[in-house]
From Swiss-Prot:
Residues 23-52 are extracellular. Residues 1-22 form the signal peptide. Its main location: host cell. Keywords: Host membrane, Membrane, Signal, Transmembrane, Transmembrane helix. It is a single-pass type I membrane protein. This is Uncharacterized protein ORF95. GO terms for cellular component: host cell membrane; membrane.
Length: 95
């Protein structure tokens, strides 16, 4: 069940990024200033990173539930990813 669920989530995430990348050039022509263009690109890149980290955390959480390994959530890697996700979200909100 988990591999199918993971495939669906990954497919949706990739579709989202393809749509946003398709719209990005149109947004860049609207901004007209190099500084605003750079900020827009940085925010898009950061959004991709945040969404990817969120997906990894979701898979890790679901994986630990289905494989009965609750220690997975306590690993150093997932703690670091969660901390990075929170700091990136704080940055996006402050912009």
């Amino acid at each position: 069940m988990l591999p199918g669920f993971t495939m669906i989530i990954t497919s949706l995430l990739l579709t989202f990024f393809r749509e946003v990348e398709h719209l990005l050039p149109e947004c860049l022509t609207i901004t007209n200033t190099p500084q605003r263009t750079l900020v827009l690109i940085q925010r898009f890149t950061l959004l991709q990173k945040v969404m990817t980290i969120h997906l990894l955390l979701s898979i890790g959480t679901l994986g630990s539930l289905f494989t009965l390994h609750p220690q997975l959530l306590k690993t150093n890697l997932l703690q670091k990813l969660h901390k990075e996700l929170n700091s990136n979200l704080d940055y996006l909100i402050s912009c």
